[in-house]
């Protein structure tokens, strides 16, 4: 488990490139036949990926001491979105088929969660966010047909995109976790511009669908103290509440956003005008 401490905005603005990447960038999400796990002190989110190829993969009791529990989801809820080939997730004996772009919400208290791929030649790639939970909501699969799509932006500003809201109150109940998938239209490069912050939630962006020799310049920092991190395919960036989170790619891409915090009101954000950025 990779543990990331919280960081004050005054400290963050003094960091060089290596320091910013060390504090906020998660470089490796998928490892064959393993799970990855990054624990952030910011709202206690856990971020990672599971890529079963030749065997099933599950999170066992090895995380118990670090999380202070007997099993992974004893006091946590889990959101998963598959960005790879067909797979299966078994939750306490119940099997859920997971095609590409399918999501699965797993409620607090699930004792055994097992991940597997249907085809080793085209393995599933399960990206997940995990947050503390105070009660149990039912485990539920969410398909692309179930999500609440919102179309934003336009070609002239290079930000035409579709926001697919997977785990939000309109789709299913969770304690605090919200997740969704945003896909840029071909030829569009910007996400979340004009940008915003949200004081009551943190957020993680996971970028994927980037072709070789492509990247995203992820913008972060306070609106008047912006910085950037160069992000490659299948990497994630942790965004504290005080930070903007936006990006521009060398070509179109897709990203999964995940938020945890004190509310789930999607529009509870503080907008920042482009003219006010520094």
From Swiss-Prot:
Zn(2+) binds at residues 196, 198, 203, 245. It holds the Pfam family KduI. Binds 1 zinc ion per subunit. Pathway: Glycan metabolism; pectin degradation; 2-dehydro-3-deoxy-D-gluconate from pectin: step 4/5. GO terms for biological process: D-galacturonate catabolic process; D-glucuronate catabolic process; pectin catabolic process. Keywords: Isomerase, Metal-binding, Zinc. GO terms for molecular function: 4-deoxy-L-threo-5-hexosulose-uronate ketol-isomerase activity; zinc ion binding. It catalyses: 5-dehydro-4-deoxy-D-glucuronate = 3-deoxy-D-glycero-2,5-hexodiulosonate. Its cofactor is Zn(2+). Its EC number is 5.3.1.17. InterPro entries: KduI, KduI/IolB_isomerase, KduI_N, RmlC-like_jellyroll, RmlC_Cupin_sf. HAMAP family: KduI (MF_00687). Belongs to the KduI family. Catalyzes the isomerization of 5-dehydro-4-deoxy-D-glucuronate to 3-deoxy-D-glycero-2,5-hexodiulosonate. PANTHER family: 4-DEOXY-L-THREO-5-HEXOSULOSE-URONATE KETOL-ISOMERASE (PTHR38461:SF1). This is 4-deoxy-L-threo-5-hexosulose-uronate ketol-isomerase. The gene is kduI.
């Amino acid at each position: 488990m990779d543990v990331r401490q919280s960081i004050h905005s005054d400290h963050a603005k003094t960091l060089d490139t290596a320091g910013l990447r060390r504090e906020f960038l998660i470089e490796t999400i998928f490892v064959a036949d393993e799970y990855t796990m990054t624990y952030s002190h910011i709202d206690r989110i856990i971020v990672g990926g599971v890529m079963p190829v030749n065997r099933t993969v599950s999170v066992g009791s090895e995380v118990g001491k670090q999380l202070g529990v007997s099993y992974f989801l004893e006091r946590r809820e889990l959101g998963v979105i598959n960005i790879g080939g067909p797979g299966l997730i078994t939750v306490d004996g119940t099997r859920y088929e997971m095609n590409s772009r399918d999501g699965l919400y797993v409620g607090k208290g699930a004792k055994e969660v097992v991940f597997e791929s249907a085809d080793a030649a085209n393995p599933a790639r399960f990206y997940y966010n995990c947050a503390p939970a105070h009660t149990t909501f039912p485990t539920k699969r969410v398909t692309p047909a179930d999500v609440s799509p919102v179309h934003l932006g336009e070609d002239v500003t290079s930000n035409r995109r579709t926001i697919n809201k997977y785990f939000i109150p309109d789709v299913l109940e969770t304690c605090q976790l919200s997740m969704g998938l945003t896909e840029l239209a071909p030829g569009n490069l910007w996400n979340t511009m004009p940008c915003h912050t949200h004081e009551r939630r943190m957020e993680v962006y996971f970028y994927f669908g980037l072709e070789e020799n492509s990247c995203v310049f992820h913008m972060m920092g306070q609106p008047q103290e912006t910085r950037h991190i160069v992000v490659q395919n299948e990497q994630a960036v942790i965004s504290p509440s005080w930070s903007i989170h936006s990006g521009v790619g060398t070509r179109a891409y897709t990203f999964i956003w995940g938020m945890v915090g004190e509310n789930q009101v999607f529009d509870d954000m503080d907008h920042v005008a482009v003219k006010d950025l520094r």
